[in-house]
Amino acid sequence: MHKESSQTCYKLELRNRILKAAMTEFLHKGVKSVKMDDIANALAISKRTLYEIYSNKEELLLEAVRIHEEEFNDHMVQYSQNKNHSVMDIIIEFYKKKLLAIADVSPLFLVELRKYKQVVAYLEQLNAERHNNALLFFRRGVREGFFRSDINFDIILKTSSASADYAMETQMYKEYSITTIMHNTIFLYLRGICTTKGIKELDAAIAE
């Protein structure tokens, strides 16, 4: 029994190490150039051991992306549950975390993700859930006086998403960093939907 428990703990630990190492490689180098051999070598494990846990790169990529997104969601849920944090605190934290997370990400990673059907399906479902949650969040912001009441937030969310897609499709990242692109699109939309009260808090947060 103790032996089985030890083996289970080892496999869980190894799985976590693989996910962490793989995601680091994917984020910095893109997906295509990272081979399963590279990940096995980085962890000093055999390729056979790696394939016993993940049968192919897409399976590994999917779980790595899922864990990455769940960690972000968990952070935002915990942050949002703090009663001292206003709507503006929450949305600023959301975009600050996004900007920090993407600062060192290779544009190739974002482009090449779209070539993996299972990952695309997962992200589409995740984005649909986030879209619905964002609509509820913006309505709360209207009630609290931070966001304008004359805005169609469904349109705002869809056009901001389309702007991000356009930046990737036209390879704008070759001219500007991903962080710069986000800062000049997302914060433009965000400032535009704010009331005077919201703008004051937004400007104060950006100045920090």
Where are these regions (language model features)?
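Short, basic, alpha-helical segments at the C-terminal edge of helix-turn-helix-like DNA-binding modules
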Residues: 66-73
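C-terminal peripheral helix-coil segments that are non-catalytic and often amphipathic
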Residues: 1-3, 136-140, 144, 173-208
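Basic, helix-initiating cap at the start of DNA-binding domains
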Residues: 1-29, 33-45, 59-62
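Hydrophobic alpha-helical connector segments
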Residues: 63, 77-104, 157-160
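Short linear capping/connector segments at secondary-structure termini
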Residues: 110-118, 204-207
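Short hydrophobic/aromatic patch on the recognition helix
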Residues: 44-54
